[in-house]
């Protein structure tokens, strides 16, 4: 096998590995995007829950002080 053929074989292997890495990278990107959407949804739920308790506490304090 000539050095040119060896180089071509190495290039073929590298291109195949590169293609596989790009595919895996795309899959990971989609997974991360999906997880980010879930986290954002959870954050909004927590924010709503916390803010409702804060409002409840403020209203209770006002009723207690003025009631």
Swiss-Prot record:
The keyword Transmembrane applies. The chain crosses the membrane at residues 44-66. GO terms for cellular component: plasma membrane. It is a single-pass membrane protein. Residues 1-40 form a coiled coil. Signal peptide: none annotated. Keywords: Cell membrane, Coiled coil, Membrane, Transmembrane, Transmembrane helix. It is found in: Cell membrane. Its main location: membrane. This is SPbeta prophage-derived uncharacterized protein YopZ. The gene is yopZ.
């Amino acid at each position: 096998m000539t050095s040119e053929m060896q180089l071509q074989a190495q290039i073929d292997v590298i291109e195949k590995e590169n293609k596989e890495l790009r595919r895996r990278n795309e899959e990971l990107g989609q997974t991360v995007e999906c997880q980010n959407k879930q986290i954002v949804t959870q954050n909004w739920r927590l924010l709503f829950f916390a803010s409702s308790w804060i409002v409840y506490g403020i209203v209770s304090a006002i009723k207690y002080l003025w009631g």
